[in-house]
UniProtKB/Swiss-Prot annotation:
Source organism of this protein record: Emericella nidulans (strain FGSC A4 / ATCC 38163 / CBS 112.46 / NRRL 194 / M139)
Primary location: nucleus
Region annotated Disordered, chain positions: 1-149, 341-363, 780-865, 894-1016
Bias type Low complexity, positions: 933-946, 981-1000
Gene responsible for this protein: spt5
Thylakoid found in the keyword field: no
Chain intervals with Polar residues compositional bias: 793-802, 901-916
Lineage: Eukaryota, Fungi, Dikarya, Ascomycota, Pezizomycotina
Biased segments, Basic and acidic residues type: 30-50, 1005-1016
Functional summary from the UniProt entry: The spt4-spt5 complex mediates both activation and inhibition of transcription elongation, and plays a role in pre-mRNA processing. This complex seems to be important for the stability of the RNA polymerase II elongation machinery on the chromatin template but not for the inherent ability of this machinery to translocate down the gene.
Protein name per Swiss-Prot or TrEMBL: Transcription elongation factor spt5
Organism domain of life: Eukaryota
Family label: Belongs to the SPT5 family.
GO molecular function: mRNA binding
Record keywords, A-Z: mRNA processing, Nucleus, Transcription
One of the GO biological process terms: mRNA processing
């Protein structure tokens, strides 16, 4: 043990600096010198080693004696032999220690005399206590000789003083190649790398949309099957696709078009036979330009493009190695089966139901709750193993800590201009152990800088550079170009100079006490307040409206000189319509510094705080309501109260059945009055829109129709109030729903919402395509023919509905039908029974001397008021308002008009009794005689029973009945000459009897007789 310790070389103190000294170069003499100095060391080591070994062997012998017991007791000879053996063993061991190198592996055996042993023993005894330290035998000055160390230090200092260029030169000389490479060191300009006409052409080939990538892979596989050097190689150079807006085409690079045709021959989803597009040389670089993809990092923010989570904010959890897919964490939207349709057919949950749009009606954002999921979908809920987090699997999706963990493709995400709002990001803050939420504002601010748009910085905004080479510069923006902002430095050594900085390195700079306005990106938009604290990218301000502190990002603020007291409080202004609760709205009538004074829909005034307002209702300029008379009222119309104070004003807001109007004559409540729509009438409409009744109906001159040269009837005026089409059963005449029946549920001016019987669905159909039908009989009902025709004669039946009149044959018991057999009504031709009245031709009893007439009998021709022929009414003194009363009345057969029930046959006439003075213009008698159609005679007169038997005399000088053209009887009350008066009893020049204007201008109803008129 002592020998090993003494053999170690601890070195000098100067050797501490270097543990790996370079090997020293020594000569042969130095080796000999070292051998001489080492020899006494070896002898001393051998002696020390022998003593130690002897002591150890003695101990071993004692142990052996104890173990062997009494086997060797008293045997002294054996002990002596063992001692001799020990001495023999120790001697060669002592000599082996002295040899180094290869001699350590060679055994030396030599005979030793006892004399030599005795001499050695004597030497050992003499040298006991005179042992020397190894350093004692070193030459003088050897312990201070550190030349090798100093030389190594000089080499290191020299290497440290060399600069990088010299070190690179030394390394190049030592390790560089001896031969120069055959390369061209000339720099080629990029413009010379652009394609030219000598390069291969690029052809655009039509393919099936969405199959571009598959076609390119098919081309690649075909090239592998027919490589260059084969019997029939593919001669194209490359093929690629661009997708997106350039879908439907693949692009093949080749020398000839024939090579492209050969490469794409008999390949599916591609159409090489169609016209190929040769890409111009100038457009080739744009076609091959690669757009740099957005780098996504865990912790960043993205938005979802489509589906139920469209435009929802999500946080990136993990990015795949290929960069094509990411794992995101977002707040789920679940209804836990509350809105499920139990009657819906069982379908694959992954397949979409037809007509269902999950983005239209989607549940609100809430963290996942296993308690809610267990209520209805317990069988779809399973707990999964997680690393200390609550992990659930619900309906095939994973939820951890209440968040949805979802794998999505990058193309389904919005990675640019995400602009996460602070309230959105707050939902992603995980709660720590002490109950506080830990929100990483640094990563959020970094995302906001990456998505900061150039419109966020306007000229004049105070900004500062917070990172980069220009960090610390303060100035104001002067212009923006893309993501580069030009800044005019206002502080520091560069004051007055203009520099450019990227948007990512800028942030807006505010000081405490600045008055700012929130411009966007936060739910506090349009808030005004004073800055009270600035911390990095977040600014805390005291709102002028709520007197509460709010924290927003500096990019969402802008210096503002506005105040929240002068007529406006933040986002609220006078005359704004606000929502107080689910059933109450109010209009702001006064704005104080910290409160709002509003007039609610019930007419009560209340003072509220801005925080009590649920939301501000955007004014609806297209809102429509109806007043007391059913007239349409809109925003901006002037209305007046019917009852009460009869106040008037301009409509500001329409909310359900309430109107908020502004009365300039009222000073209180800022002139705002709230009334119900049923208590107002329209005074004037905005923009001159007609709202009242059509005044043209009140002008008799405009209502005259039928006379030659007279005005045509005006188009039917717009009706107000409830539409008569509502609730009616209708039939669709044309279109995709032709032939289907339905009920009208709602109408507009030109369209109707019809609930179809067959499909049980609501469709919108134009009104002109609908026909009203009777729900029982299926007959067509005409509800749009105005106010109907004249009254039915007294001797006819009660008026029938508009769709029943004037049909032939018809067995119903009312008038205006031919033939009729069993009715007790008159005015039928021919008829065999009745009330015994005249007016039948031929008639066989009771006043049979009369010519057919549609009304009461005893006419033809007579002087009294009840015997005028022709006339459509049953009154003896009736008169018409038209020049064409004579021919438009009910004395003709056939006729179509709705004047009376005495026409045969007619297709659409009706015997309505609305007004006997309302005649139809331009009656079209059938078979088509001009103005009248005598039966059975022809044009020019209506002799009865025929042209050959005039009554009461011959044709030339007699008075045929009803007369040539017409016999206007009775006359109207002196409205001037009639162009078609029928002179009686002769055809020329005599006074008409009882012609038009027979009564003159008087109104007493008595006949007037002139000279030349025969007496009755």
């Amino acid at each position: 043990m002592s020998r090993n310790l003494m053999d170690q070389d601890f070195g000098s103190e100067e050797e501490d600096d270097d543990f790996n000294p370079a090997p020293a170069e020594e000569s042969d003499n130095e080796e000999a010198h070292h051998d001489k100095t080492r020899k006494p060391d070896r002898d001393s080591d051998a002696r020390n080693g022998s003593d130690d070994e002897g002591a150890d062997e003695a101990g071993e012998e004692d142990e052996e004696e104890n173990e062997e017991g009494g086997e060797g007791e008293g045997d002294e000879e054996e002990d002596e032999e063992e001692d001799e053996d020990d001495d023999d063993v120790s001697k060669p061991r002592k000599r082996r220690k002295g040899h180094g190198g290869l001699s350590a592996f060679i055994d030396y055996e030599a005979g030793v005399d006892e004399e030599e042993d005795e001499v050695e023993d004597e030497e050992e005894e003499e040298g006991y206590g005179l042992e020397q330290h190894p350093d004692d035998v070193l030459p003088a000055g050897a312990e201070t000789d550190d030349r090798q160390h100093r030389r190594l230090d000089r080499e290191r200092e020299l290497a440290a003083t060399l600069d990088a260029e010299k070190q690179a030169q030394l390394l190049k000389e030592r390790y560089g190649r001896n031969r120069a490479a055959a390369t061209d060191a000339v720099i080629v300009p990029k413009r010379l790398l652009l394609p030219s006409v000598d390069d291969p052409s690029i052809w655009g080939v039509r393919c099936k949309a969405g199959k571009e990538r598959e076609v390119v892979f098919s081309i690649q596989k075909r090239i592998e099957d027919r490589p260059p050097g084969s019997r029939n190689p593919i001669k194209i150079i490359s093929a690629f696709e661009r997708g997106g807006a350039m879908s439907g085409y693949i692009y093949v690079e080749a020398r000839r078009q024939a090579d492209v045709m050969d490469a794409l021959q008999d390949m599916s989803n591609v159409y090489p036979r169609t016209k190929m597009i040769l890409v111009p040389v100038k457009e080739m670089p744009d076609l091959l330009r690669v757009q740099k993809s957005e780098e996504l990092n865990p912790g960043g923010w993205v938005r979802i493009k489509r589906g139920k989570y469209m435009n929802d904010l999500a946080q990136i959890e993990e990015v795949e190695t290929n960069g094509l897919a990411v794992t995101v964490r977002l707040v789920p939207r679940l209804d836990y089966g509350m809105n499920e349709d139990s009657g819906a057919p069982i379908m694959d949950p992954k397949r979409k139901r037809p007509g269902a749009n999950p983005a239209v009606a989607r549940p609100p954002q809430r963290l996942f709750s296993e308690a809610e999921a267990k209520k209805k979908h317990s069988k779809y809920l399973t707990a999964t193993a997680g690393l200390g987090a609550k992990s659930w699997n619900y309906l095939g999706e994973t939820y951890i800590d209440g968040f949805l963990i979802k794998d999505m493709k990058v193309q389904h995400l919005i990675t640019k201009n995400v602009n996460p709002r602070l309230e959105e990001v707050t939902m992603f803050a995980r709660d720590s152990e002490n109950g506080t939420s830990n929100l990483d504002l640094a990563s959020l601010a970094e995302t906001l800088k990456n998505s900061t748009a150039e419109e966020s910085y306007l000229p004049g905004d105070p900004v500062e550079v917070f990172k980069g080479e220009q960090q610390g510069l303060v100035g104001r923006t002067s212009s923006t170009r893309g993501d580069i902002v030009t800044i005019l430095v206002t502080e520091g050594e560069l004051a007055g100079q203009t520099i450019e900085a990227p948007v990512k390195t800028l942030r807006k700079r505010f000081r405490e006490g600045d008055h700012v306005k929130v411009i966007g990106g936060s739910r506090y938009q349009d808030e005004l307040g004073m800055v009270v604290q600035v911390r990095d990218d977040t600014v805390t301000l005291l709102s002028d409206m709520s007197m509460q502190e709010i924290t927003v990002f500096s990019k969402d603020l802008r210096l503002s000189a506005e105040t929240g007291v002068d007529g406006k409080l933040g986002m609220f202004d006078v005359h704004d319509l606000v929502q107080l609760d689910a059933a109450t709205v109010a209009c702001i009538v006064k704005v104080d510094r910290e409160s709002l004074r509003v007039l609610d829909q019930n007419g009560s005034i209340r003072t509220i705080l801005p925080s009590q307002v649920t939301n501000k209702i955007t004014p609806r300029r297209d809102a429509v309501a109806t007043d007391r008379n059913g007239a349409e009222i809109r925003h901006g119309d002037t209305v007046r109260e019917v009852y009460g104070e009869q106040r008037s004003g301009v409509i500001l807001h329409i909310h359900r059945s309430f109107l908020f109007i502004h009365n300039k004559a009222q000073a209180e409540n800022a002139g705002i009055v709230v009334v119900r729509t049923t208590n107002v009438v329209t005074v004037s409409a905005k923009g001159g829109r007609p709202t009242g009744p059509d005044l043209s109906k009140m002008n008799p001159a405009l209502m005259r129709n039928g006379a030659p040269g007279g005005m045509m009837a005006p188009p039917p005026s717009k009706t107000f109030g409830r539409d008569r089409l509502l609730g009616k059963t209708v039939l669709v005449k044309k279109g995709p729903f032709k032939g289907l029946l339905g009920i009208v549920k709602d109408t507009t001016d030109v369209q109707a919402r019809v609930e179809l019987h067959s499909k049980n669905k609501l469709v919108t159909i134009p009104k002109e395509l609908l026909v009203v039908k009777d729900p029982v009989t299926g007959q067509t009902i005409d509800i749009g023919r105005g106010r109907g025709g004249p009254r039915v004669p007294q001797n006819s039946a009660a008026p029938s509905s508009g769709w029943q009149g004037g049909r032939t044959p018809m067995a119903a018991a009312d008038s205006s039908r031919t033939p009729a057999w069993g009715a007790a009504m008159s005015s039928r031709t021919p008829a065999w029974s009745g009330a015994g009245l005249g007016s039948r031709t031929p008639a066989w009893k009771a006043d049979g001397s009369r010519t057919a007439y549609g009304g009461a009998g005893s006419r033809t021709p007579a002087w009294n008021a009840g015997a005028r022929t022709p006339y459509g009414g049953g009154f003896g003194s009736g008169s018409g308002n038209s020049d064409f009363d004579a021919f438009a009345a009910g004395s003709r057969t056939p006729a179509w008009g709705a004047a009376s029930g005495s026409r045969t046959p007619a297709w659409s006439a009706s015997a309505n009794t609305t007004s006997r003075n309302d005649n139809k213009a331009y009656d079209a008698p059938t078979p088509g005689a001009t103005y009248s159609a005598p039966t059975p005679g022809a044009y020019g007169g209506a002799p009865t029973p025929g042209l050959s038997a005039p009554t009461p005399g011959a044709w030339a000088d007699s008075a045929p009945t009803p007369g040539a053209y017409n016999a206007p009887t009775p006359a109207d009350f002196g409205e001037g000459s009639r162009p078609y008066d029928a002179p009686t009893p002769a055809m020329g020049g005599a006074a008409a009897t009882p012609g038009a204007g027979a009564y003159g201008d008087t109104d007493d109803g008595a006949p007037r007789y002139e000279e030349g008129t025969p007496s009755p």
